Design a protein with these regions (language model features):
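Alpha-helical scaffolding segments of alpha/beta enzyme cores, especially the outer helices
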Residues: 137, 141-145, 174-181
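Catalytic His-Asp segment of secreted/periplasmic serine-dependent ester chemistry enzymes
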Residues: 164-230
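N-terminal secretory targeting modules
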Residues: 1-66
Length: 230
């Protein structure tokens, strides 16, 4: 009888231990995820390239007749001014930028009250495993800030482009559908995804690395938005 009681007691202790161990593991993993997200959101603060580009943009003027291309590396790596032969175009793309990074530097753009802003941002958020709700929240903050600080500016939200990862493109397509819902009279959504996607991927003819566009890719992008730029 004593032996059975001892076994029951040990069994209860082990169950209690495993329960608390499981709770601690769940809490620890959740805490790590929160810290990782927080670090991702603030990566631009420690990114020397981002800070250098931002400091340069702070010294450059944007005027009321300008057209601003705002985004990450996909925006940054094109020669928009030459593509459109338009000296009023200003490239404000930064490689690796996210919705948080755009929010952080938006003042350098809205203070000049540009005529138009072409915005493409979000792929790096998705690559960093940010959830759609967070990205959309930042998008709304970006659009609201533009509307408040520069009410006459027309914003063109360009859909995120596909890449060569089919699973990633499912997330991209879902986010694009949500972005389209944010459109209004002064926020115009431009669907570029469907123009670039083929068999659920970005075709090799438009890219060398599966993500960034080559010359042909940028020519197609230009063709798709030409009527909005001019």
């Amino acid at each position: 009888m004593k032996k059975r009681n001892i076994i029951c007691f040990i069994s209860i202790l082990l169950n209690i231990f495993f329960i608390f161990s499981g709770i601690f593991t769940i809490y620890k993993n959740h805490r790590v995820q929160i810290l990782q997200k927080d670090n991702i959101n603030k990566n631009f603060i420690k990114n020397a390239y981002y800070l250098a580009k931002q400091s340069q943009f702070e010294t450059l003027n944007i005027n009321s007749g300008d057209i601003v291309f705002l985004g990450d590396s996909l925006t940054n790596r094109s020669q928009w001014q030459e593509l459109f032969n338009n000296s009023h175009i200003k490239n404000r793309g930064i490689d690796g930028d996210t919705t948080s990074g755009i929010l952080n530097r938006l003042n350098t753009i809205t203070r000049g009250h540009p005529k138009k802003i072409f915005l493409m941002i979000g792929i790096n958020d998705l690559l960093h495993k940010q959830d759609t709700a967070y990205i959309l929240s930042n998008y709304e903050k970006i659009l609201n800030k533009i509307r408040t600080d520069s009410p006459d500016t027309i914003v063109y939200t360009e859909s995120i482009l596909p890449n060569n990862n089919i699973k990633s493109n499912r997330d991209v397509k879902f986010l694009n559908n949500e972005l389209q819902k944010l459109s209004s009279s002064k926020i115009i959504y431009i669907d570029l995804f469907d123009r670039f996607v083929k068999y659920d991927k970005l075709p090799g003819e438009y890219t060398y690395d599966g993500t960034h566009l080559n010359g042909l890719g940028y020519s197609i992008w230009k063709h798709e938005i030409n009527k909005y730029v001019n």
